[in-house]
C-alpha cells in the first residue's frame, strides 16, 4: 500500500492507550461533539478493523469534508477547545466509503498509466539506442570508404604526375626529332604574336590523332630514324582549294604530337567526351613517294612502342583532365606540335555554353535546334564555316583580344552565329600558319549534351594573322562597313507580294554579294550546311542550295513553286529564295521575335508566321536578351528587321500576349522565308525608327519571354488550307481533315490545342483573318478530337459490341454473322487463336473465392426474385430503454451461430464416415459372394488420337488451326446457309431461354475442379462448403 495511507506512528495530544491508537488521530474527532444519545466508546466493535470506514468518515458528507488526514497537523490545536469540525451527518458513512473506493481505483489507474508510460519510454530509448548504433556503424563504414577514396586520389595523382613526366619526355624527344626536319617549300613564319583571327571548326578532329599519340608514347630514348620520314606521311591536301588564313581544319600531321594530353588544350581543360570524338573523319594517307625501307622502319618502331602502350592505358583511364605546358614555337620549324594536335582555344565558359545552346540557320532560313541533328551530320564533321572572320575590325588589335569585356564577348559570339546559309565551304589545310597559344583564364568549359550525342560540337580556334591578311587589312575595313550598311538596308525593307518582282531583287543581291566577295579577295571554300531531317525535306521542299550561277537559283525557285498547293498561286513558297546576303549581327542575334517588321507603323500587329520558338527556360537565354539590349544602346544607327526565322515543325509555341493580335493585322507586306528580302525601290525614309522605339520593343519582347517561362507551352493552330492527303487522326473522321476541322472549341490560353499537319506555307494577314473567321464559325460545330492514343481507343471502343466469350472460342469464330459474310467458307472449322482440344487441361486455374463467387452468380441467375435480407436504420432516442435492442457485435453473432455450425460439421463427418463404411461393406459383400478368384489382367495400353511423331511427314506454319474432336477435323457447319444452331450464338438465339443458355457459363462443382489438395484439405473443404452430398439420407431408427 502507498505510504500516504499508512497511519502516523507519532503519538499526539489526547492519545488514548487503546488497541487502536490511530482512531483519535484522524481529522474528525468523532466522540467529542457527537450526538447526545451516541455511545461514547471509541469502538463499538473492539475486535473489528475500521480501516476503510474510518478513512471514509474523514471525508464524510459534512462541512469539513476537505479536512482529510493531510490536514492533521493544522487541526491539532483545536482539539482542546472541543474540536474544530462539525459533527457528521446521518448518511455520511455510506457516501464516504464509496468515495474512498473511487479514490483507490483512480490511484491504481494512475499507477498503471505511469507504468505504461515508463515502459513506452524504455522502448523508445532502446530503439533510439539501436538507431545510434546503426548510425555509428554507417559512419565507421563511411570513414573506411573515405580513407579508400583518399588513397585512390593519391594513386591517381601519382599516375597523373608519371603520365605528365612521360609526356614531357616524349615532347622533348619529338622536338629534337623535328629540329632538322623542315620543308623548303613553305615560306618562313613571322614571329609569334597574339592570335587575332577566330575560326570555327568541329571538335571531331582529335580522336585519330589521340589514338596515334598513344601508339608513340615511350619512356626510353628511341633511335632517331623517325626523323628521316618526309612530311608527306599522313597528310592529304585538297588540291582544288586555295590556301588562306581563314581555313585551317585538316592540318598535315607529319609527326605524332604527344605534347597535349587527353583533356588539355592550351592549358585549358575541356570535357573528355569532346576529345574522344575528335579526329574521327581525318584521313591518313601515306605519301606515294615514301620509300619501302622507311615503311619497314616505321612498322618496327610501332612494334616497339606497342609494348609500352599497354602500361599507359591503365594510367590514362584514371586521368580525366591533364595540364600540359604551353608549347614554344621552335625557331625555323614551321610544323609545330600544335599544328598536328589541332590546338583549340575555349574562349570562356559562357561562349561555349551559348554555342551549345545556339541555333544554327539552315539554307532556307529556318532555325534548327542542336538536338534535332541526326547522325547524318557526322559525314560533314570535318567541314565548317570560317569565312566570317574577315569582317571583324576589332580583331586587329591585340589589346582588345586580351581584354575583352562581357559585352564584346557577346558581340563576338553573335557575329560568329551570322552564317551565310547559301555558301558551302570547306576548310582547306594551311601549312604556313602556326597557331599561337594565347593563355586565357583557366575556366573549365562545361559542355552539355543535349539530345543526340552525335551532334557536331563547334569550338573557336584562334589563328595568327598571315601576311595576306595584313596586306588586305586596309581595304577590308571600309568595305566591311559599306557591306554591313547595305545588309541593314536590305533587311529593313519589306518585299511586295508579287512573284515576278522578287527574283530581280534576289539577282541583284547575288551580284552585289559576289562583287563584295571579289573585292575582299579572300577565297571562301564551300561549306556543306547541316543536313536537315528527311521528313522536313519532304514536307517543305527545302533544298541544299549552293553558291552557283543565277540559272541554278531559278531552277530551285521553279522546283519549289511546283511543290506548293495549287490553291495558293499568289503566295511565294518558303524555299523559293535562299538567303544570299549576309545578315548582320543584330539580325542574327535578335530575340525570337513575334513581331513583324519593326519599321512598319506601330499599328501593324504580329504576323502569325513569326511565332515564338520553344519557351526559354534557360537563364543563359535571358542573359543573352539583356546583352542584346545593351548592344542596341551601343549602336543607335542599327536598324533591325524581323529575324529569328521559325521552323514550323519545331516552333508551335506562341506568346500569350501576341495570340489575339493575329486577328487584326492590316499590313500588306508579305514574309518570304520569314525574312524581309531586298527591295531597294520600295525603301522610304519615313519608315526609319529611332533608338527609343527599338529599345522599347526589345523591352516588351524581353517581358514576353520572361512571362512565357511561367506558362506552359502552347501550340498554335495554324490556319492552313485543307489538305485531304495527309491526316494525323486514325481512324480518319468522316469530314476531310484540315486545320479548321480539327480546331477545337475555345479553350483557355494555357491549354495546348492540337495542331494540324505542319505545312510550310506563307500566311499573310488577310489569309489569317479569313481562316480565323472560318475556325470561329466551325468551332461550335466541330467536336474536339485530340491527337492522343486515348482518342483512338475511345473512338474504336464505341463501335465495338460487348459480348461475353464462350468457353474456348472467340466471338468471331462461331458467330453466324461472320459465317454469312464469307470469311469462313472452308470445309472444316478453323480458329485464329492457339486452339487446344484438351479442354480438361484448361480447368486447372482458379481465383480466390471462386466457388463462392460462382455460387452467388448461380443464386442470382436461377431466381432473380430471391429475397435478400434488407434492413433500415431506426433512430432510437437516448432516453429509451435498450432491452429490445439486438446486439450486432461479432462475438454475439459467432456465439449465436456456433451451435448450428458445429451441428453441420458433425453431420457431415457422420455422413462421410457412414459412406466409407458402406463402401467397405460393399467390398466385403462382393468378396464373399464371388464364385471364382479374379485374375489381375494387364492394364490397357494408353493410346491417343493424335498422329505419332514418327508419322509426321511435313510441318506447315499456318495462321488458322483446324479444330479437332476425337482426332478428326470438325466440319464447319456454319459455312452452310441451311444450317444454324440458335443456342451457340446469343445474337441469333430466338428466345430468351436459348439466349441465356448461350451466355451461361459451366457450373463449377467440387467434382469438376481438379484441385491438387491433400486428403485433409479436401475433407475440410467438403465439410465446410455449402454443397450437399447427392445421397439419400436414411432416417435413423429409434431403438
From Swiss-Prot:
Pfam families: PEHE. Keywords: Chromosome, Nucleus, Phosphoprotein, Ubl conjugation. Residues 255-266, 397-407, 504-515, 523-570 have a biased composition (Basic and acidic residues). Residues 368-392 have a biased composition (Acidic residues). It is found in: Nucleus; Chromosome. GO terms for molecular function: chromatin binding; DNA binding; protein-macromolecule adaptor activity; transcription cis-regulatory region binding. GO terms for biological process: chromatin organization; dosage compensation by hyperactivation of X chromosome; sex-chromosome dosage compensation. InterPro entries: Msl-1, PEHE_dom. The keyword Ubl conjugation applies. Residues 1-44, 171-199, 244-266, 358-454, 485-691, 729-799, 1011-1039 are annotated as: Disordered. Residues 865-983 form the PEHE domain. It comes from the Eukaryota. Residues 431-445, 581-592, 609-625, 759-768 have a biased composition (Polar residues). Changing residue 18 to A: Decreased ability to promote phosphorylation of 'Ser-5' of the C-terminal heptapeptide repeat domain (CTD) of the largest RNA polymerase II subunit Polr2A. Does not affect dosage compensation in males. Belongs to the msl-1 family. This is Protein male-specific lethal-1. It comes from Drosophila melanogaster. The gene is msl-1.
